[in-house]
């Protein structure tokens, strides 16, 4: 008998195996009919097709969207792959465990360590030594809140609020207020709307979704069952909540079974929850009452009112008081609505002067209304009269102010400073503050003291006691001591100023040619003499005796101190504008100034400062042109200019001031330009100047550059900064030095001492030449439009040039360049484009010129746009002004039917101006002409072969015209003509 063995630990059990009774079971085979057709599963194919999707859905989870829809959230393919691999690993572990050979389990441990029960410490439990509590614990039944309880709570809340006229707040994202009030002996519920607070909204109230049921429940008071007709609603019913089924008449749409009254529009009562347009909101009748206004007025009136000793009695009617209050409110705070924020903003945006003017105008109008409507309110009339009197403008004397300012505005000495302050005080009038009144009284006191202490026995202008010593302390320049402006060697960093300084070096400096030697540049010729530079000392002899010999200068024998050395203003010396003296009154005479290479030397007090000149394109030395040595003053001012303003500064000097000054300007004109530059660039007021030597023999001021001076004995001007130099620009300054000339060689010079400035800008002839040059050279046109865009205006001088620039798309190019930089230039180009289109349609030259003149006024308004740093700007304004005035003067002749143009003269001028347009090939070389001729001939031949004879004749005439225009009539060679004839045949 076979047995089975089961072993567990040390136990072994032998079990007998029972023999099977029957090992084989025979079943008779049933015969199957082959003719039976089994039905096929209709969903087998569908299930097979959907099997991947259903298998994927087995791993999906269910989630709910914001709309409440339940959807499947499928796993990503990577996550499903990880899950499948994990499942396969688990199945593999189970399979391996089940197929493992039998083994004996002799010990079971946790973590391979000792049994936890053996690790516990045995503790002896002792009873607690305390008195047992006799308190009986009560078990409280938890409060449960059901739907019925909530309805009961709302009913009790509604009854309580109705009895006590309370306000219920429903608080969600926003707060909604429901006020329980009495209306015509019935209880009613009112919702607080936006327009009741003075705020107009498209939706007067916004209820959250959960609030609708609560509002419906709380609104079921005594008015809920009453019928309401649309005509029965009136002011004061805003926010009233009514039963939607109990409404009769014209009512707007509503929802949730209740209607919140807002107002009436076009006879229809509207729900406050409905969204309306702002036009409807503005014009509709809203059923609110001014209770909030009156409650606020009554609340604050008792607090801020004036205390009185008498008993107040009602003398004036309430209606009249309301009208008077409206007049006063409009007089002080003119607005359309008191609650409008835009009206209040308009008042806040007014300046103080505008506010005073509006107050004067409104109080005058209010006084007129009070006298006509309510003259019995005399106290109101008196107060308004006082306000109008205080706000009346008292600063009409601008002509007097201008006259006083012209006489003493530039004077900075007492008592003129006090007079100028009082003049400014009088101009401001009622705008003066209490502090300014106190300051004006102090200035008046100083004037009284001056007049009292003034005596005529003080001797002025006595040169016997004149002393003007040079300060031993050097001028401190922050720009030369700031670490950010210096490199590691403490040298000044020009930065972007170095690039823009090239405008000075390219136009007003020349390179020193070493082949000529330094001696060729040693003599600086002046109209009445010469001055020797120390440039020859750049070659240093090693012989000490020779070097000492070169250190000796050439004395110029200048005169002693005299009136010509001084400058006076009102009898007082202006010391910065005088020559310097020693302690004994003798003039300080200049010594030999040693030369340096590529340095700018500034400062005339103490130790001079040496600044490295901006680097040029080459390593050659530069020297100022004859007559332009004063350019070193502008170069010294450039040190104090910021890098962002360097371009603007250098262009102003080159394009505006240098053409005015030219060669040999007077010191007065030079100081005037410095004063003008100081307005645009205030940082230059303390810029240090180079040494200025005064030559009284030749009445010349020499600006010493880096090459020094061998000529000695000159007087030294004390002015060391720009702010001191501009003192020479005063017409009232009594000085001979201010008429001295500054610079180099003079050519046909005429001293200009009047107040008329020299003309600067570009002539019309040169402007036309530049435009014509740009028409045939796109690069030149681009450069002209980038640097001098106002040259476009000169195209109106000739209709032919205007049309040529239009065809060349020059105006479109100007718009592209300046559209994002300056708005006036694209506008000018647009006007000229439209003008060119009109001119091209005109049939006669006179009509074209008339069209151009009529557009001059519009162009002038657009072009005149403040100060512009442009060489052609002032000339363009002059041209447009002349054409505008000419058009106005000729308007009467045109209206009378007369032609103000001389036909022959107009044709002559137009022919002269447009002549360069018809001869653009005059300067082209012969090779270029031959090349162009071959191109034209090839074009004729190809056209003749391809097209008909009639079309070819037209093409031949056009090409003939182009050729004659370029080369002149009859230029087409005989060979070319014969080839054309053969091609035609």
Swiss-Prot record:
Involved in interaction with stylet and aphid transmission (motif): residue ranges: 337-340
Gene Ontology BP terms: proteolysis; symbiont-mediated suppression of host innate immune response; transport of virus in host, cell to cell; viral translational frameshifting
Active site: 195 (for p1 proteinase activity), 204 (for p1 proteinase activity), 238 (for p1 proteinase activity), 629 (for helper component proteinase activity), 702 (for helper component proteinase activity)
GO molecular function, one term: serine-type peptidase activity
Domain Peptidase C6: 621-743
One GO CC term, this protein: host cell plasmodesma
Record flagged with keyword Transport: yes
The enzyme's E.C. designation: 3.4.21.-, 3.4.22.45
Similarity comment: Belongs to the potyviridae P3N-PIPO polyprotein family.
Protein name: P3N-PIPO polyprotein
């Amino acid at each position: 008998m076979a047995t089975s063995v089961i072993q567990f630990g040390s136990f072994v059990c032998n079990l007998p195996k029972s023999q099977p009774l029957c090992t084989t079971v025979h079943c008779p085979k049933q015969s199957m009919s082959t003719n039976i057709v089994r039905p096929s599963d209709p969903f087998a194919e569908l299930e097979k097709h959907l099997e991947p999707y259903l298998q994927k859905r087995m791993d999906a989870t269910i989630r709910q969207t914001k709309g409440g829809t339940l959807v499947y959230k499928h796993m990503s393919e990577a996550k499903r792959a990880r899950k499948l691999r994990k499942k396969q690993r688990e199945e593999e572990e189970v399979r391996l465990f089940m197929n493992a050979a039998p083994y004996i389990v002799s010990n079971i441990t946790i973590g391979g360590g000792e049994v936890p029960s053996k690790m516990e410490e045995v503790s002896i439990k002792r009873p607690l030594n305390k008195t047992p509590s006799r308190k009986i614990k009560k078990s409280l039944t938890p409060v449960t809140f059901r739907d019925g309880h909530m309805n009961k709570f709302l009913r009790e809340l509604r009854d309580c609020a109705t009895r006590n006229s309370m306000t219920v707040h429903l608080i969600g994202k926003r707060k909604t207020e429901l006020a329980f009030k009495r209306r015509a002996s019935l209880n009613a519920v009112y919702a607080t709307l936006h327009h009741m607070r003075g705020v107009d909204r498209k939706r007067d109230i916004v209820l959250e979704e959960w609030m609708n049921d609560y509002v419906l429940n709380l609104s079921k008071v005594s008015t809920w069952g009453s019928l309401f007709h649309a005509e029965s609603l009136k002011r004061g019913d805003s926010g009233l909540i009514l039963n939607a089924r109990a409404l009769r008449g014209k009512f707007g749409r509503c929802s949730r079974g209740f209607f919140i009254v807002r107002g009436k529009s076009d006879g229809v009562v509207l729900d406050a929850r409905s969204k309306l347009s702002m036009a409807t909101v503005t014009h509709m009748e809203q059923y609110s009452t001014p209770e909030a206004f009156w409650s606020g007025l009554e609340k604050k009136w008792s607090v801020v009112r004036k205390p009185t000793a008498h008993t107040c009695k009602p003398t004036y009617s309430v209606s009249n008081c309301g009208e008077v209050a409206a007049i006063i409110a409009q007089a002080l705070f003119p607005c359309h609505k008191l609650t409008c924020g835009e009206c209040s903003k308009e008042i806040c945006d007014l300046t103080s002067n505008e506010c005073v003017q509006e107050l004067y105008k409104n109080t005058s109008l209010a006084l007129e209304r009070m006298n006509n409507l309510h003259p019995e309110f005399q106290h109101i009339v008196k107060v308004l009269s006082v306000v109008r009197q205080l706000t009346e403008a008292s600063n009409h004397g601008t002509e007097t102010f201008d006259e006083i300012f012209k006489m003493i505005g530039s004077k900075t000495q007492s008592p003129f400073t006090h007079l100028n302050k009082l003049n400014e005080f009088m101009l401001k009038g009622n705008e003066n503050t209490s502090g300014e009144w106190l300051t004006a009284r102090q200035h008046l006191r100083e004037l009284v003291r001056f007049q009292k202490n003034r005596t005529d026995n003080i001797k002025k202008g006595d040169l016997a006691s004149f002393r003007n010593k040079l300060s031993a302390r050097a001028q401190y320049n922050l720009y030369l001591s700031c670490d950010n402006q210096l490199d590691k060697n403490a040298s000044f960093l020009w930065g972007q100023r170095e690039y823009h300084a090239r405008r000075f070096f390219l136009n007003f400096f020349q390179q020193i040619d070493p082949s000529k030697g330094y001696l060729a540049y040693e003599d600086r010729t002046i109209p009445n003499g010469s001055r020797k530079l120390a440039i020859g000392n750049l070659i240093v002899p090693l012989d000490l005796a020779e070097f000492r010999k070169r250190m000796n200068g050439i004395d110029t024998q200048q005169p002693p101190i005299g009136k010509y050395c001084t400058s006076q203003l009102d009898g007082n010396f202006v010391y910065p504008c005088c020559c310097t003296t020693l302690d004994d009154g003798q003039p300080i005479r200049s010594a030999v100034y040693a030369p340096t290479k590529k340095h700018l030397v500034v400062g005339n007090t103490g130790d001079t400062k040496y600044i490295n000149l901006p680097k040029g394109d080459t390593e050659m030395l530069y020297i100022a042109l004859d007559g332009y040595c004063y350019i070193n003053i502008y170069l010294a001012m450039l040190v104090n200019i910021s890098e962002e303003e360097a371009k603007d500064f250098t262009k102003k000097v080159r394009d505006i001031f240098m053409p005015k000054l030219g060669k040999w300007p007077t010191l007065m004109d030079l100081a005037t330009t410095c004063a003008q530059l100081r307005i645009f660039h205030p940082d230059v007021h303390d810029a240090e100047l180079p040494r200025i030597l005064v030559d009284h023999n030749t009445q010349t001021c020499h600006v010493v550059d880096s090459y020094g001076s061998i000529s000695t004995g000159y007087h030294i001007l004390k002015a060391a900064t720009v702010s001191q130099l501009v003192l020479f620009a005063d017409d009232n300054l009594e000085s001979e030095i201010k008429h001295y000339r500054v610079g180099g060689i003079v050519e046909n010079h005429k001293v200009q001492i009047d107040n008329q400035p020299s003309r600067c800008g570009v002539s019309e002839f040169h402007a036309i030449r530049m435009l014509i040059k740009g028409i045939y050279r796109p690069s030149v046109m681009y450069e002209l439009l980038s640097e001098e865009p106002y040259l476009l205006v000169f195209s109106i001088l000739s209709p032919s040039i205007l049309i040529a620039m239009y065809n060349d798309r020059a105006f479109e190019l100007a718009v592209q360049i300046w559209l994002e930089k300056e708005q006036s230039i694209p506008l000018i180009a647009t006007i000229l484009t439209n003008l060119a289109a009109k001119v091209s349609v005109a049939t006669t030259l006179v009509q074209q010129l008339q069209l151009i003149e009529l557009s001059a006024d519009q162009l002038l308004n657009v072009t005149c746009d403040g100060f512009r740093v442009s060489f052609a700007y002032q000339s363009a304004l002059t041209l447009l002004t002349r054409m505008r005035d000419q058009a106005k003067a000729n308007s009467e002749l045109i209206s009378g039917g007369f032609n103000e143009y001389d036909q022959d003269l107009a044709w002559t001028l137009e022919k002269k101006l447009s002549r360069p347009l018809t001869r653009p090939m005059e300067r082209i070389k012969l090779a270029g002409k031959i090349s162009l001729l071959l191109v034209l001939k090839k074009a004729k031949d190809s056209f003749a072969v391809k097209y008909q004879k009639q079309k070819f004749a037209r093409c031949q005439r056009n090409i003939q015209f182009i050729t004659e225009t370029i080369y002149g009539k009859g230029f087409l060679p005989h060979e070319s003509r014969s080839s054309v004839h053969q091609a035609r045949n």
